[in-house]
Amino acid sequence: MRNDVHLGHKARKRFGQNFLNDPYIIDGIVSAINPKPGQNLVEIGPGLGAITEPVGREVDKFTVIELDRDLAERLRNHPELASKLTIHEGDAMRFDFKQLVKPNNKLRVFGNLPYNISTPLMFHLFEFHRDIQDMHFMLQKEVVNRLAAGPGTKAYGRLTVMAQYYCKVVPVLEVPPSAFVPPPKVDSAVVRLVPYEDLPHPATSLEWLDRVVREGFNQRRKTVRNCYKGLAEPETLETLGINPGMRPENLTLAQFVALANWLDATHKTHA
């Protein structure tokens, strides 16, 4: 059998499909999710049901979002799952997750995310952080390292700062390429993202936060003084607790937010 065909379905490159087929890993992921009846569970990209089936054995109803028409059809006719699933056929990147929220029942989102869209998809989900209890995702290991990174490390970047702005990040388990059909060329890992009830460092303007973070990491080897020249004077940076001689890659989330909030307040005053 060809190594890109699994359970009679050929993996589609344009959808970034790699199907999980290692029972030990699947068991570890389902244990991490810990699904319970009555919870508002949403799976992104169920594929051939490697995680969907064991989750379905634990709960009576849940929602899946699948872009691949053939796979969505397969789930509609699944002997065990068909009666339990609400299937949304379409692109999770454009999906309004608010429509799935129920009173006092936040979303628990999980999935083996296509690696080619995982970062923009997470940014899309962060917009719904108030409606999400937690998220469990299989991602490229390098992306999980970035999500969990600390200031001054090579992996620390825009994704780190914005993920940690919204969520507590907990790496759960590492997954080798051999756990998939076809095997990807990279190692994978599962991460748990838990949105904060109250943001630890709230920004008064997400536009300003996004701007200072982007500009900082686009010029990560410059000093903070040079990176934000024209936005903030060195004296202002020092007042905010930021050393103008350090590099942006060494700034903490709290420092990025302090700078963004100062810029927001200053521009509102001058508006």
From Swiss-Prot:
EC number of this enzyme: 2.1.1.182
SMART domains according to UniProt: rADc
One annotated GO molecular function: 16S rRNA (adenine(1518)-N(6)/adenine(1519)-N(6))-dimethyltransferase activity
GO terms (BP aspect): rRNA methylation
Pfam families found in the cross-reference section: RrnaAD (PF00398)
A GO cellular component entry from the record: cytosol
Record localization: Cytoplasm
Keywords: Cytoplasm, Methyltransferase, RNA-binding, rRNA processing, S-adenosyl-L-methionine, Transferase
Enzyme class of the recorded protein, top EC level: transferase
Catalyzed reaction equations: adenosine(1518)/adenosine(1519) in 16S rRNA + 4 S-adenosyl-L-methionine = N(6)-dimethyladenosine(1518)/N(6)-dimethyladenosine(1519) in 16S rRNA + 4 S-adenosyl-L-homocysteine + 4 H(+)
Domain of life of the native organism: Bacteria
Binding-site residues for S-adenosyl-L-methionine, renumbered to this chain: 18, 20, 45, 66, 91, 112
Function in brief: Specifically dimethylates two adjacent adenosines (A1518 and A1519) in the loop of a conserved hairpin near the 3'-end of 16S rRNA in the 30S particle. May play a critical role in biogenesis of 30S subunits.
Family recorded in the similarity comment: Belongs to the class I-like SAM-binding methyltransferase superfamily. rRNA adenine N(6)-methyltransferase family. RsmA subfamily.
Record's protein name: Ribosomal RNA small subunit methyltransferase A
Organism listed in the record: Vibrio cholerae serotype O1 (strain ATCC 39315 / El Tor Inaba N16961)
